[in-house]
Amino acid sequence: MTNTIPNWIKLNNEIMIQKDGKYQFEKDKEAVHSYFVDYINQNTVFFHDLKEKLDYLIKNDYYEEEFLSKYTFEQIKSIYKIAYSYKFRFPSFMSAFKFYNDYALKTNDKTKILERYEDRVSIVALYCADGDYEKAVEEVHTMMKQEYQPATPTFLNAGRKRRGEMVSCFLLEVGDSLNDISRAIDISMQLSKLGGGVALNLNKLRAKGEAIKDVENATKGVVGVMKLLDNAFRYADQMGQRQGSGAVYLSVFHPDITDFLDTKKISADEDVRVKTLSIGVVVPDKFIELAREDKDYYMFYPHSVYKEYGQYLDELDINEMYDELVENPRVRKAKGNARKLLEQLAILRSESGYPYIMFADNVNKVHPNEHISKVKFSNLCVTGETLLLTENGYEKAADLYKKQNDLKVVIDNRTKDFAVGSKGTTIVDAIPMQLTKKDAEIFKVKTKQGYEIRATEWHKFYVKRDGEIQKLQLNQLKTGDKLLVQSAEGAYGKIHEPDLAYIMGIIAGDGTITEKTAKIYLYDNKKVLEQKVTDAVHRIIQKHKVDRAYKHNTSLLPTFNMANPEKQDLLYMNSTVLFDILKKFGMNKETKTRVPEFIFQANKETQAAYLSGLFQTDGCVNANHKAKALTIELTSIHYESLQDVQKLLLNMGVYTTIYSNNKRSQELLPDGKGGSKLYNVKPTHKISIQDRNSRELFMSIVEMKEYDVYKFNLLTETLQPKSRKPKHDFTAEIISIEEDGVEDVYDTTQEDYHSLIFNGIVTGNCSEVLQSSQVSVYTDYDKEDEIGLDISCNLGSMNIVNVMSNQSIASTVRIAIDSLTTVTRKTNIVNAPAVARANTLMRSIGLGQMNLHGFLAQNNIAYESEEAKDFANTYFMMVNFYSLQRSMEIARETGETYYKFDGSTYKSGEYFEKYVTNDYSPQYEKVKKLFGDQHIPNIQDWMKLKEDVMKYGLYHSYRQAIAPTGSISYVQSSTAGVMPIMERIEERTYGNSKTYYPMPGLSAQNWFFYKEAYDMDMFKVVDLIATIQQHVDQGISFTLFLKDTMTTRDLNRIDLYAHHRGIKTLYYARTKDTTQEGCLSCVV
């Protein structure tokens, strides 16, 4: 018996039979017509009307009745009428075949067809609108115009009575116990049965040879678990309609990594080889660094790490912890060579296409929800002596850590909206100070004006560049950058000691402290202060006298004496009692010139009194009437002391600059005996108050000597009523960034705006320490399980060609988000409790895209061109904008935001920085024309959206993910995802016949724009995907296309370039056999 080849297959094959030297693309449409007339129509069950059809499908358990009962029959009929009004025709045989073979509902024996394309679209629209007729109308229009296509699980299952889940993919954490492993396998099978793809994180599993209950060399490692999963996924599928799909991930720092990779070797032994299970490798930046330096590297046994640190290997920041793990003798480790492993990865990917690669730090660096990702030990941190401005004034980070109190901190208003003009401060809540890393590498940032800070390279700063505010990590700063410093009066403490503060200021300026005595000197025009100082000292002694025995001649009411009665040029006071009181409050011989710690937590009157005493003795008003220049200055040989004063003044709203004279010199100074003589002096430094606003504010707060007040007023009266705006604009210019040792570091989290003021400098803060995916702990039957957070996501994709043709980006995104949201709400996977919990709390969706190469080719734009990047930059920005907008609107409508939204960079506004500072409109005129009359969101639109999101929140934790779009691309007659095509005319084998699929709209005119991926420069492909990635909050399915002439070194170069450009993940690496190549271009 011979199998007859159907007529539609013959017609499709005639595409490749040249006529006049050209392919016969028109034959594909003839094949579609034959397929319908000769097969589809002949095998479709006939119903007299829609009611008869629906009654039959419900009665025989093909359709759910519940979702249909939410509409009237007239509404349902109207949706079907809309669908059929389009008179839809599949443009290619492959698209029609894919739909009817993979998606159309069939009788139980699979012999008869129960749905046409219009029927499936109508049911999906009704199901995803969930009783909202107007939404159902929008969705049926959008799907019939093929602007939006739900992913396979939704398109296949929506509305069916016997169905799988509509969620596309899951990620499970696997705990390190037999109960955890068994439960993970069971849940994987349940999810596979429902039609979902499942990825599992194996990094918590003990490596081969680790101990169990202190018995060494007892564990089998990850490969045994992989074999179990491989068999599980092959066994559990969706009733034969959709095969099970699983993937497992392991870090390059796990000791089983080599065995893990060997499971995909073509030559691997059957005992270790996995057949259907996909594998992926997690690559942190530290590994890339070690490979570039051609160094050996260490892998760490997870259980020994857990025993030592109480956290799993994949929960640690390996970039920061690597050296500590290497040096820690209690952490078991194995040695390897980073470059050799990179080479092994390249060889295996060339042979099998595996493993997938995830660049862990590229994912985390731009993760808007990093506050609920794994713990970051090296996030945004400062050293212990750094002063944080709180509602109680300045307090040391280390001291706050010891107290562990909830904080109220002062922030600069410019960090709220990134507006240069929004000067001012606000007091907001923050969590208790945290010790975020021990022995962290420290860098010192110095500014031209004297402000300094010591922090880790990840600490974030607010920088004014090109008139705009940006938030940058320390390792992104450069000399010349202008850091924001506090722009208005802040907050003060509650300590009230103005007399004590005043005398401390006097002594810091013109006093000395010996081993037992405090001395105060008054000379020249300072002698007028005699009575004021004497009265203050007496009040201090009366209030704070130390309970101790003094000599009989010790005065409790010390007075000034004349050092040289004849000259009457020096007054001095000695007091042992005052010495004891000053010592009690932290002032002694060594600390005399530093601002006492309690002053930083004192009230404004007390701080002003200290500054008054200091400036009355060591300060002056420098007035130049000719130049109309007026400055208030304070000179000292102690630079750090002036920095203390600078912080106090900045908190009062007074901007200062510190100047240094680094040359040693001689000065005429009092000799302590009533006379003067030349002394060698150390280099001097001067704090200067120059701008008019700061000068006048200072004089209203701090009491200067009468003569200085006279000079100040005399010149001020000659100035214009209004002065120009200060040039400093409350910024400080960086002059150096230097390594500065290793120390413990601290930080807190201010969840509203993620900003703080350290040492007067406006900075970012740490994100909250939680995990986005939390491992579950499954116990024995008599104990309660601990359910964590696994990850689920339902997908759908927009067809770029049709969306752009219909000028409908905004409306399609809105409709797609609504549809995906309904799927999320209607999903409850009880067999996977951690997935169900995450779906309820996180509400993640994944709006993707397809037909990018098709769109570019049909508009005569080369995939590798600058114009392609220009289009992608604008298009994907718009999708991001409208998806954020719709998620915000749903949050506003429902009053609900996703779990822990308040800790996200969406809430802080940080996420929007690049959008409110950069214009993403098209740069090329040709690309501009493609967008037609569609509104392209501008900076003002983004600023409004930022404001709305910060106010109302977001409903979804994740919104975009660009999947490969395999089968649904064929249904849409689309190129897959955002990747370039592999072949201009695909050849497929079904049964005993071949079929051909020309790329959508392929013609002689666009033939060369449909360049095949294997002929492209992969570096330029990386550039285009990197352009897209910056607008996509999740990942992109990115396949590398290689020729077999490429070396492993070539592949490594591409991988490293992808990492450098911020690519998050690399999917398959496909290799083409160049010996089979033929030339097709001559027969177009």
UniProtKB/Swiss-Prot annotation:
Gene Ontology molecular function terms on file: ATP binding; endonuclease activity; ribonucleoside-diphosphate reductase activity, thioredoxin disulfide as acceptor
Protein name: Ribonucleoside-diphosphate reductase NrdEB subunit alpha
Activity modulation comment: Under complex allosteric control mediated by deoxynucleoside triphosphates and ATP binding. The type of nucleotide bound at the specificity site determines substrate preference. It seems probable that ATP makes the enzyme reduce CDP and UDP, dGTP favors ADP reduction and dTTP favors GDP reduction.
Enzyme class: oxidoreductase
Positions bound to substrate: 152, 168-169, 197, 964-968
GO CC list: ribonucleoside-diphosphate reductase complex
Description of how the protein assembles with itself and partners: Tetramer of two alpha and two beta subunits.
Superkingdom assignment: Bacteria
Site (Allosteric effector binding): 176, 206
Active site: 379 (proton acceptor), 381 (cysteine radical intermediate), 768 (proton acceptor)
KW Nuclease (keyword) present: no
Domain (DOD-type homing endonuclease) ranges: 503-654
InterPro entries to which the protein is assigned, alphabetical: Hint_dom_C, Hint_dom_N, Hint_dom_sf, Homing_endonucl, INTEIN, Intein_C, Intein_endonuc_central, Intein_N
Organism: Bacillus subtilis (strain 168)
Site positions for Important for hydrogen atom transfer: 169, 793
A Pfam match: Intein_splicing
Residue pairs linked by disulfide bridges in the UniProt entry: 169-793
Post-translational modification note: This protein undergoes protein self-splicing that involves post-translational excision of the intervening region (intein) followed by peptide ligation.
Positions bearing the site annotation: Important for electron transfer: 1067-1068
